[in-house]
Design a protein with these regions (language model features):
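Non-heme di-metal
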Residues: 1-251
Length: 251
């Protein structure tokens, strides 16, 4: 159990009012289950151990979040019953690609929350290592994809590429549904994409995307240059910046 700092009244109100805690706890719990279930099917001992560590860290993130909401009296909706996925590889890929999206925006939002003072320094210090672990998770995942693709039989590759495509379609469809739920006042599952407004910041969309790109590069820079980096989301973000780059604020 972490010794959570006592926050000022305004800071505590800001933190407890964020519409993310239910889904954050549930997402980490589900991610831990998906990753650990896939690890059980991996025959290589070293790779299995690495994936198990990934799953352990996902579950640890869940406990950190659960301790936070308990410490600050945040009410959570009851968690659903999680069942082991029937297709462990699909579940692992959904979790991995989903984290590639969410972590990219989370890097920028965390930076914005830190710089604007929305997150008090005490919480920044607590969560910065968690954010760094998410960077390592997505780096591990995209290199697993490359390794898995290279080592599978040629006849399996078309099926695998279709599976990758299906995962992306699923994630896009899921986020479209999330956006609809948010507009109807439900819990904000898509906070990592819509979070600038929730943070009460006057950062415009172009500025937020630019921060996300810079923070994504910074978080991944310390790792071996031979390792592959997530490319799709940063690539799309850079294209978006050509059209909606940071706007100059009027005096």
């Amino acid at each position: 159990m972490l010794d959570w700092p006592k926050l000022g009244e305004e800071a505590e109100k800001r933190i407890t009012a964020l519409p993310i805690w239910d889904i954050a706890v549930q997402t980490e719990n589900r991610a831990g289950l998906n990753v650990c279930t896939y690890a059980e099917s991996v025959p290589d001992p070293l790779l299995r151990k690495a994936i198990e560590l990934n799953g352990f860290e996902e579950r640890r993130h869940r406990h950190v979040l659960a301790n936070l909401v308990e410490a600050y009296g945040i009410k959570l909706a009851p968690e659903p019953v999680y069942e082991k996925p029937k297709d462990p590889e699909w579940a692992f890929m959904v979790t991995g690609y989903s984290e590639c999206i969410d972590s990219f925006f989370a890097f920028g939002l965390f930076k914005a929350a830190k710089d604007t003072g929305y997150f008090p320094p005490e919480l920044v210090q607590t969560f910065d290592p968690v954010v760094n672990e998410e960077a390592r998770h997505i780096l591990f995942f995209v290199n697993w994809v490359a390794w898995h693709r290279r080592n599978m039989p040629l006849w399996r590759r078309p099926y695998f590429e279709l599976k990758v495509f299906a995962v992306w379609i699923f994630l896009i469809y899921e986020r479209m549904g999330i956006a609809s739920d948010v507009s109807n006042g439900q819990q904000d599952n898509n906070f990592t994409v819509t979070g600038a407004e929730q943070l009460g910041s006057d950062i415009n969309v172009g500025e937020l995307i630019a921060i996300c790109v810079a923070e994504n590069d910074r978080r991944l820079k310390p790792y071996d240059v031979r390792l592959k980096r997530p490319r799709f989301v940063p690539f799309m973000a850079r294209i978006a910046l050509k059209f909606i780059g940071p706007k100059k604020k009027t005096a």
